[in-house]
Swiss-Prot record:
Swiss-Prot/TrEMBL cofactor(s): (R)-lipoate
Signal peptide residue numbers: none
Zinc recorded as keyword: no
Protein name: Probable glycine cleavage system H protein
Species per Swiss-Prot/TrEMBL record: Korarchaeum cryptofilum (strain OPF8)
């Protein structure tokens, strides 16, 4: 299972990659494997301020519907529409969701947040790739 070492992970299977004060967020390959075919992915609108742990969006699949949680606090500044991610309340038709499945850690990112808090405290309780792999081996 692919778990890149250049980002942080949550117990709910989101990943975050930090680039200066920006946080690129997606879901892990493990989450995708558990979900099955992704049919819809909706996130809060651009400009929304969101706190760490709050619901960022929802992903629907052939098996279930799951919430996506914000691993850090910030303002949504970018939404990956190229991968079929749509804004909450939008009438857009999702096109390109397969990119999230095929390349969840690069092309398949979901949103970018501009981090609004102290970055080190925002990252404090997130897992490294090694810790995330241990978490998965423990059956989570």
């Amino acid at each position: 299972m692919e778990v890149p070492g250049d980002r942080f992970y949550t117990k709910t299977h989101e990943w975050v990659k930090i680039s200066e004060n920006r946080a690129i967020i997606g879901i892990t390959s493990y989450a995708i494997e558990q979900l099955g075919d992704i049919t819809f992915l909706e996130v809060k609108p651009k400009g929304t301020l969101i706190k760490k742990g709050e619901v960022l969006g929802v992903v629907e699949s052939s098996k279930t519907t799951e919430k996506i949680y914000a691993p850090v606090s910030g303002e949504i500044v970018e939404i990956n529409r190229d991968c079929g991610v749509v804004e909450e309340g939008s009438s857009e038709v999702p096109i390109g969701l397969e990119k999230i499945v095929e390349d969840p850690y690069e092309e398949g990112w979901i949103v970018v947040l501009e981090v609004k808090g102290d970055l080190s405290s925002e990252l404090r309780d997130l897992m490294s790739s090694e810790d995330y792999l241990k978490h998965l081996k423990e059956g989570h």
